[in-house]
Amino acid sequence: MSEVRDYAKEVSDWVDGVMEYLEKIDITDSPLLSNIERLSGLAKNMDEEEMDYEDMVLIEEEMARVYEAIEELSREFNIQEGQSVPIGKHTLPPLSYAYDALEPTISREIMYLHHDKHHQAYVDGLNKAELMMKKARETNDFSLLKHWEKEAAFHGSGHYLHTLFWEVMIPGGGGQPRGDLLKQIEKDFGSFAAFKSHFSEAAKQVEGVGWAILVWSPRARRLKILQSELHMVLTQWDTIPILVLDVWEHAYYLQYKNNRAGYVDKWWDVVNWPKIAVRFTEAKKLIWKEQ
């Protein structure tokens, strides 16, 4: 019974996050709301005797439909708003899959804490920093500006990297990319195997906590692998991240203990190459003249 309750709570939390996001973009009348209401009802009516594999599939399919609709609404909202988020109004993006969907690679407990607690803390920290700097402008008191700029850099980078991190993973992922992305990887790194080894070692060798990041450089017109300590140290400007791997301890420690290498090696099983390929295609559209 407890496992069913836990799953029901996760679905309910996901629905709450979706509703918060829809409220933010002022969606009050949409066919999507009926889907969300149906999903919420499924979560509330879960019962251990009645819950079976088909029920879970039904819930996962409903969540996928809701997420696809949200992505479309989000695109429309960004166009209408000029891709602008009001100061201090960043929100936690909902996941497109349940917290247990990446098991056994990443446990449900890790995903819940990582997304619902850690990522939310970055969102809150970014919002607070933005509002405090807005207040500084309004009062012409910049005595704490250095502090709030650091807070914005840390929490803002954490928020944006985590948002991408959730997107580049998917249940049943893995394998290797195809098409133009694979060709570019082979061109820039020699082979997919060489790229994978390089990226994995970059992740394993991050000093302390941080990220491994595959970026597209519009000026160099090639892919690069970067490390980032914390969320924003040792990276390069004027590049576009297309694949990121979180190697902060909160991303793996509850499951892999101090075996970061084991986590990195298993993580490739959930990589969402189709999504990464889309980001690569869009990133290549930005062209700068090399200076």
Predicted features, each with a name:
Residues 1-291:
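Feature for soluble, non-membrane regions of globular proteins
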